[in-house]
């Protein structure tokens, strides 16, 4: 039975669900440890009344295989070195290995999700398309993290990502 999560319970549950596998753990697709902000940092950078605001110190990403979800919060300061580091937070091999531990003979849904500065991207597919899903996820991650804050804000305020406008024009 599921329970509704409200207010501060959300943060408590997020802290409780953290997969702290050190530098990857045995089955985690991630090669970097969770870098979630401390309680003090969280309060400093977040408004309790606006639950939709992201902490500007980094971004959240997750991999899900069926009902098993691995989550990470990674620090990102928009420098080239930081970008290179966080792009290596997982690889196709580490995702395939983690998925193989949880996926049986049946096709199971696989999901990658990333949230950065109020923009959330989720990519889903079946376990048979995992390699293609990994390729799309790394491209999406790289493009999202390289957007300037102005580009992110304009996309959010327009209510759609950049590619959707192009698709609408081509389909008319």
Swiss-Prot record:
Residues 1-27 are annotated as: Disordered. Keywords: Host-virus interaction, Inhibition of host innate immune response by virus, RNA-binding, Suppressor of RNA silencing, Viral immunoevasion. Residues 1-20 have a biased composition (Basic and acidic residues). GO terms for cellular component: virion component. It holds the Pfam family Tombus_P19. GO terms for molecular function: RNA binding. GO terms for biological process: symbiont-mediated suppression of host innate immune response. It comes from the Viruses. Homodimer. Belongs to the tombusvirus protein p19 family. Acts as a suppressor of RNA-mediated gene silencing, also known as post-transcriptional gene silencing (PTGS), a mechanism of plant viral defense that limits the accumulation of viral RNAs. Binds to short interfering RNAs (siRNAs) with high affinity. Acts as a molecular caliper to specifically select siRNAs based on the length of the duplex region of the RNA. This is RNA silencing suppressor p19. It comes from Carnation Italian ringspot virus (CIRV).
């Amino acid at each position: 039975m599921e329970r509704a999560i409200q207010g501060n319970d959300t943060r408590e549950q997020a802290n409780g669900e953290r997969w702290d596998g050190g530098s990857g753990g045995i089955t985690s697709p991630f090669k970097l440890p969770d870098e979630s902000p401390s309680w003090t940092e969280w309060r400093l950078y977040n408004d309790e009344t606006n639950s939709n605001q992201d902490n500007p110190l980094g971004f959240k990403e997750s991999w899900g295989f069926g009902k098993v979800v691995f989550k990470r919060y990674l620090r990102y300061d928009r420098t080239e070195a930081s970008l290179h580091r966080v792009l290596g937070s997982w690889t196709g091999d580490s995702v395939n290995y983690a998925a193989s531990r949880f996926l049986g003979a049946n096709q199971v849904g696989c999901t990658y999700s990333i949230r950065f500065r109020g923009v959330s991207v989720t990519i889903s597919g079946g376990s048979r398309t995992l390699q293609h899903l990994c390729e799309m996820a790394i491209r999406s991650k790289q493009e999202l993290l390289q957007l300037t804050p102005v580009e992110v804000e304009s996309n959010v305020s327009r209510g759609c990502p950049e590619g959707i406008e192009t698709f609408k024009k081509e389909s008319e």
